[in-house]
């Protein structure tokens, strides 16, 4: 059975406050039956130097991605992962990670592809937990198999593909959440990160540039609903919004904001993102600070 929502007034203004928990709530419910805590970091070694008691590690690269095909794991693989991590289908899953929950939001988005009903983020993530000097451990919990059922992914509601993006150009909101250097075409990869093989630089025509990190404050918590509404005030209730970055990890954070904190009904994450678009043949690309227009073919 799902655990109760966090009643904190700091969350109540969001469209779906039940998708977030505070550190106080997690501390109070630690060890409760039906609670699964997951750490998913960009730096996959952080879990091993200390983590929230009872938390299991999910490696975004090796656990969530198919080892051969460039795609996510399938239903059988996800069920095996959940069994191995001791997570049941009806558990309340709280995910947290480093860097303002960047990769934690990615893991939550993948859980959503498989229809796990109750999955939440720890507001502020790992960094805030440590800043508040809350309890950590080196102990890795022993988990038993849960009999997690095989449920195949349902990509359509929240995942966009290249042809979906081509179909909405100049008709629906498209948001590029990457760094300014990536958006303008000055570089093909994130600053301070290695080159990943994109052949072209720039952005998709008509894409508005709103870096993902603008949705979080200095502590790593999400900004208030009022601040977020101002940031994304160009999105109308009936819009079909698509967000993208390089492989869908940063845009998962923006997807979470739009879907769960602002209550936008139709938001999809284009996880192929610039790794696909920047290598694709005959797709339109714009360089510079302006969104640009769709070229006439």
From Swiss-Prot:
SMART domains: RHOD (SM00450). Substrate binds at residue 250. The keyword Nucleotide-binding does not apply. Its EC number is 2.8.1.1. It catalyses: thiosulfate + hydrogen cyanide = thiocyanate + sulfite + 2 H(+). Keywords: Repeat, Transferase. The keyword Transferase applies. GO terms for molecular function: thiosulfate-cyanide sulfurtransferase activity. Pfam families: Rhodanese. It is an enzyme of class 2 (transferase). InterPro entries: Rhodanese-like_dom (IPR001763), Rhodanese-like_dom_sf (IPR036873), Thiosulfate_sulfurtransferase (IPR051126), Thiosulphate_STrfase_CS (IPR001307). The active site is at 245 (cysteine persulfide intermediate). Residues 31-138, 168-286 form the Rhodanese domain. Contains two rhodanese domains with different primary structures but with near identical secondary structure conformations suggesting a common evolutionary origin. Only the C-terminal rhodanese domain contains the catalytic cysteine residue. This is Putative thiosulfate sulfurtransferase SseA. It comes from Mycobacterium bovis (strain ATCC BAA-935 / AF2122/97).
């Amino acid at each position: 059975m799902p655990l109760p929502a966090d009643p904190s007034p700091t969350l109540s203004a969001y469209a779906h406050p039940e998708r977030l928990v505070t550190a106080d709530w997690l501390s109070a419910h630690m060890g409760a039956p039906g609670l699964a805590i997951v750490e998913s970091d960009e730096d996959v070694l952080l879990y091993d130097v200390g983590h929230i008691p009872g938390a299991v590690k999910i490696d975004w690269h090796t656990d969530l991605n198919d080892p051969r095909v460039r795609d996510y794991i399938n239903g059988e693989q996800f069920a095996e992962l959940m069994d191995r991590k001791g997570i049941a289908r009806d558990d309340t899953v709280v995910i947290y990670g480093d860097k303002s929950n960047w990769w934690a939001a990615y893991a939550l988005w993948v859980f959503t592809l498989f229809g796990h009903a109750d999955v939440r983020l720890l507001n502020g993530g790992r960094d805030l937990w440590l800043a508040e000097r809350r309890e950590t451990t080196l102990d890795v919990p022993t988990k038993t198999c849960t009999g997690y059922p095989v449920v195949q992914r349902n990509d359509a509601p929240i995942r966009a593909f290249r042809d979906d993006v081509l179909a909405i150009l100049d008709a629906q909101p498209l948001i590029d959440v990457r760094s300014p250097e990536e958006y303008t075409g000055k570089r093909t990869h994130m600053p301070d990160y290695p080159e990943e093989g994109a052949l072209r630089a720039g952005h998709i025509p008509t894409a508005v540039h709103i870096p993902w990190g603008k949705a979080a404050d200095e502590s790593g918590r999400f900004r208030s609903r009022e601040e977020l509404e101002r940031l994304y005030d160009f999105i109308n209730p009936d819009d079909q919004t698509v967000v993208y970055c390089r492989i869908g990890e940063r845009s998962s954070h923006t997807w979470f904001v739009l879907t769960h904190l602002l209550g936008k009904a139709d938001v999809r994450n284009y996880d192929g993102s610039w790794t696909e678009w920047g290598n694709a043949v005959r797709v339109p690309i714009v360089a510079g600070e302006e969104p640009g227009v769709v070229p006439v073919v």
